[in-house]
Amino acid sequence: MSRVGKKPVPVPAGVTATVDGQTVKVKGSKGELQFRVPDQVAVTHENGAISVQPRSQTKEARALWGLSRAQVANLVEGVTKGFEKKLEINGVGYRAAVAGKVLKLSLGYSHDIEYEIPAGITITTPRPVEIIVAGIDKQRVGQIAAEIREYRSPEPYKGKGVKYADEFIFRKEGKKK
């Protein structure tokens, strides 16, 4: 039995949620999101909460039960609070700047990398070595942060590169003479 799936997702005041068949639509102060729940799972909206139940007891249905409940909870949290990922840049001369709808990254290559900021996502650089990716869709925020990190992922000897703010880089010792 899914411990995550058992709990109904409370819908706070100021948020409207509608369940139309297998589609859950959530509208809040920050925007509107929708998610299509897999067919193996039934979703209902009652008493100010959205509950998710498996249609059968197959292993796949039970796995999708917890996943679907977590996805619906992320929709509600996204339209109320939003999500953000912080990235840090380590390395001499490595920096980032936002110019309009473009994130400009100087990461030690012969050219600057220009990353087009997608709609629905805000990227800010409070300092030249700090990037904050924010939005209402948790999956997109994480995906964009991962794409930015991928341009120069941290290396294990000096730790140079783009890393998540809470990420620990396992360091290696250099060659010995």
Swiss-Prot record:
One of its GO terms (molecular function) is rRNA binding. Pfam families: Ribosomal_L6. The keyword Amino-acid biosynthesis does not apply. One of its GO terms (biological process) is cytoplasmic translation. GO terms for cellular component: cytosolic large ribosomal subunit. Keywords: Ribonucleoprotein, Ribosomal protein, RNA-binding, rRNA-binding. Part of the 50S ribosomal subunit. This protein binds to the 23S rRNA, and is important in its secondary structure. It is located near the subunit interface in the base of the L7/L12 stalk, and near the tRNA binding site of the peptidyltransferase center. Belongs to the universal ribosomal protein uL6 family. PANTHER family: 60S/50S RIBOSOMAL PROTEIN L6/L9, LARGE RIBOSOMAL SUBUNIT PROTEIN UL6M. This is Large ribosomal subunit protein uL6. It comes from Methylobacterium nodulans (strain LMG 21967 / CNCM I-2342 / ORS 2060).
